[in-house]
Amino acid sequence: ITVDKFGGEAFRAAVSEGNTKLARLLLEKGADINYHKPDMVFPNAPTAVTEAARHKNLPMVRWLIEQGADITIADKYGDRPYTVAVQNKNQELADYLKSLEPEDWHNEQEKVRQLMPYKLPAKLVEYLKTGPLRLEFPEQEWVKWAELYSYMDVQEMTRKRKKLLSLMAAMDNYSDYLLLWSPRDKKLWYL
């Protein structure tokens, strides 16, 4: 058993737990810094740098990037380090990662071109551009609020070979629910 072939899972777990010493050792021994296969702990197949961003560990994110981590790799739900920082409202980390991402990913004209095949209703586009992005449900027992992505941060994802757009950044009490736009059905989905 060699670290270069089988060390990716352990490396990602070490980074997720903030164990810099073990992460350095595994990387020195050849672990894949961009490993992103699903397993029982990480079913969405994130990279180590995405996990560091999820845990708001800016020093770890910086170190991983210095070591060659690819911040453009998205997990199975379309999350990448930048979008995780946005979800976590970690502006310092989001700004840092945005400065390193391809410029056209944050260009509105390019976003319009990218999202055109999704046939989003004009009212939804306008709402995502102007907000409010936080929806309040004070009378509901289980979900008091949900926060949508801004138009520029809407994420593309694939589920069962269908292209979808992820519209929701966070929801009260349910961290793993998704609000999705299906261009094929021209409807909102939730998972």
Regions flagged by a language model, labelled:
Residues T2-A13, H36-A48, A74-R80:
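Ankyrin-repeat boundary/"N-cap" motif
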Residues K187-L191:
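A short, surface-exposed interaction/processing loop segment used at functional sites
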Residues K21-L22, P59-M60, E92-L93:
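Conserved ankyrin/ankyrin-like repeat signature
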Residues E51-D75:
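Internal alpha-helical scaffold/solenoid segments in large eukaryotic proteins
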Residues Y77-S182:
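A surface-exposed partner-binding patch
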Residues I1-T2, R24-I33, R62-D70, Y96-P102:
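Ankyrin repeat domain, specifically the short helix-to-loop turn at the C-terminus of the second helix
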